[in-house]
Amino acid sequence: MINEIRKDAETRMDKCVESFKGNISKIRTGRAHPNLLDGIQVEYYGTATPLRQLANIVAEDSRTLALTVFDRSMSGAIEKAILTSDLGLNPASAGTVIRVPLPPLTEERRKDLIKLVRSEAESGRVSVRNVRRDANDKVKALLKDKEISEDEDRKSQEEIQKITDLMIKKIDAALADKEKELMDF
């Protein structure tokens, strides 16, 4: 029973870490990367459709993304969706190809992005701690029902804490990498 609780907690904490990494991967660093446009939805025949389903996205060079639109009539809607996104990008259309140059990041914008990344990291840590609290509550319930001894309770809480510490270290490492990436480029 305790092993199940521990494994469940570890799985849920791992999902929190992966969610955090996914969130910060969408934050632009000044380097062109196709994943940068992942969050953009385009109005396609009355339905919000992910941009990836309407165009092939490639990094043309370190500062430019090129989108090859599958349906030429959608070029205008795709441009509008990129313009209205909060990424601060200005696309230029040339037939079926839309080029999206990435402006260099200003020092002020870098600092804002670092604040955003740190905020995401704190949210990730809080999520991990919430999972820890849930797991510890389940273990305490077992102790209260006299299904486990106090020694087993203490031991399992220590194991859950070790897992929590490991997951928070993963979040901190990803945070440090992203901060370095933002400041170096």
Curated annotation (Swiss-Prot):
Q: Could you confirm whether the keyword Transmembrane helix appears in this record?
A: no
Q: GO cellular-component terms in the record?
A: cytosol
Q: What main location does UniProt list?
A: cytoplasm
Q: Which InterPro entries match?
A: Ribosome_recyc_fac (IPR002661), Ribosome_recyc_fac_dom (IPR023584), RRF_sf (IPR036191)
Keywords, ordered alphabetically: Cytoplasm, Protein biosynthesis
Matches recorded under Gene3D superfamilies: 3.30.1360.40, Ribosome-recycling factor (1.10.132.20)
Q: Does the keyword Protein biosynthesis apply?
A: yes
Family in the record: Belongs to the RRF family.
Q: What is this protein called?
A: Ribosome-recycling factor
Originating species = Edwardsiella ictaluri (strain 93-146)
Gene that this polypeptide is encoded by: frr
